[in-house]
Amino acid sequence: MALSLTNFRIEPVDGMLALLPNQPILQGCQVSSAQPTALNAGDIVTIDGTNAKQGIITVKKAAVTDTPLGIVLTDPIKTSFAALDRVSVIPVNCYCYKTANANITAGSKLQFTAEGKVAATSTASNGYIGIALTNATAADQLIIVQVQPGMEPAAAAA
């Protein structure tokens, strides 16, 4: 997070909560032991049922074909989370900032890219992360997303 020295506003970053200060967060999730790279704020994660431990929500970075659980929350102290680290996840019905991969119109249903950016696409059998609440007029702009994870239905057989 960047604090402006002239007007004392916090600059938004990918994976930071937006709009409501008291949103529920999934605290104490654990990064899967099978996660090959560290997770970062803003990464989209899914549940790892294969490597789960009893009573602990175990997460890994979501592939575009996974149904996501939520988004890794920005942490002002720790910037990345390795395997077996504890991590907080922004779940369904919360609002956060995400980086757009291209132009996005508010109201669009959002899928995500392998890089973790949001995209206004509807590719069959791919996961989606939520709804755009603000516009992006170019790639790499931050938008506000209402987290609504799910899966785009498979294409109908002809």
Model-assigned labels for residue ranges:
Residues 1-158:
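Surface-exposed, low-hydrophobicity beta-strand/loop segments enriched in small/polar/acidic residues
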